[in-house]
Amino acid sequence: MARKNLLKGFKKPKGLEFAQQESTESYGKFTASPFETGFGTTIGNCLRRILLSSIQGYAISAVLITSHDADGVPHTISSEFENIPNVSEDTLEILNKLKQIRLRLSDESEQGDFHFEFKGPASITSKDFAVEGQLEILGEPFYVMELMKGANVSFDVQVDFGRGYVPAEVNEKYIEIVGTIPMDAIYGPVLKVSYAIEPCRVGQRNDYDKLILEIWTDSTVRPEDVLGEAAKIAKDHFSIFINFNENDYLGEDEDDNEEAVIKQLLATSINTLDFSVRAKNCLDSAGIKTLGELAQKSEDEIESMRNVGRMTLNEIHAKLAEYNLRLGMTDYSHLKNTIKVSRQKEETDEA
């Protein structure tokens, strides 16, 4: 049994600050304070480890390479140790370059197979593996291989959605076509994470922690999105250790902070909500970044936005209703009286 007022007097961050001016598709800087002494390091290290090891992404998991001679007769390159005729680079070197390609499927599906044909003389770069409307190649293009005169080679590439690092030995178990070469797949889209702790003053005390978190991704996903995913993973793992009903032990300080909780809810990023790609793109184009900004829009304003149809409008209504919100809520006092903050929303969604 937990003690009453378990968190009374315990300092917790009021929200997350996002450095908008410094952010890009591949970089984000976040600040949260105040934490009790030591908690900044605990939270920062936990998020860093999850971000680097457990975020999902896309990678090439297998490739079938076929060379064609002058008469068009095909020959399958059976392993990474067999070289491709009239290609300057070793097959192993080419496979290493393919591992480095950062990509994503346009329809957000979990697997895709793509066929590419190249003839020499030509210099092939990472961008040559893009398929319009289906397979996006992110980042600056880089050199993959040089095809000499007479080279005629095709690549059948399998792209998978996964988590972390999966060695070729594991991917080999799922190969069905003889001659397909399994590859080490690095799915994680997070390239680098660093955090720093600075002293933070609250009242007369200056020994609280301020957590500064910096995230670099490969541009396939935005830093604020992967941070939300990492926090969700951590929360779900910690929840099994709670052996009491949290609603029965809400401290008085949480009741006093109702307004702060509502503000935090309204500051929720649209990118962290489970909207469809179409709805997200419409809201992003209209400059709507948070749940509060969306709730303040009228239905007429939403309908006038580009590419918003009836299905997208219904989706927005349904999403706002999950938080007991609706379109056209512009009076803050009205929000405070009508919003019922569900402290266990995510647990209910999953149950």
Curated annotation (Swiss-Prot):
Residues 1-245 are annotated as: Alpha N-terminal domain (alpha-NTD). GO terms for molecular function: DNA binding; DNA-directed RNA polymerase activity; protein dimerization activity. Its EC number is 2.7.7.6. It catalyses: RNA(n) + a ribonucleoside 5'-triphosphate = RNA(n+1) + diphosphate. InterPro entries: DNA-dir_RNA_pol_insert, DNA-dir_RNA_pol_RpoA/D/Rpb3, DNA-dir_RpoA, RBP11-like, RNAP_asu_C, RNApol_insert_sf. It is an enzyme of class 2 (transferase). GO terms for cellular component: cytoplasm; DNA-directed RNA polymerase complex. The keyword Signal does not apply. Residues 262-351 are annotated as: Alpha C-terminal domain (alpha-CTD). CDD domains: RNAP_alpha_NTD. Keywords: DNA-directed RNA polymerase, Nucleotidyltransferase, Transcription, Transferase. Pfam families: RNA_pol_A_bac, RNA_pol_A_CTD, RNA_pol_L. SMART domains: RPOLD (SM00662). GO terms for biological process: DNA-templated transcription. It comes from the Bacteria. Gene3D superfamilies: 5' to 3' exonuclease, C-terminal subdomain, DNA-directed RNA polymerase, insert domain, RNA polymerase, RBP11-like subunit. Homodimer. The RNAP catalytic core consists of 2 alpha, 1 beta, 1 beta' and 1 omega subunit. When a sigma factor is associated with the core the holoenzyme is formed, which can initiate transcription. NCBIfam families: PRK05182.1-2 (NF003513), PRK05182.2-5 (NF003519), rpoA (TIGR02027). DNA-dependent RNA polymerase catalyzes the transcription of DNA into RNA using the four ribonucleoside triphosphates as substrates. The N-terminal domain is essential for RNAP assembly and basal transcription, whereas the C-terminal domain is involved in interaction with transcriptional regulators and with upstream promoter elements. Belongs to the RNA polymerase alpha chain family. This is DNA-directed RNA polymerase subunit alpha.
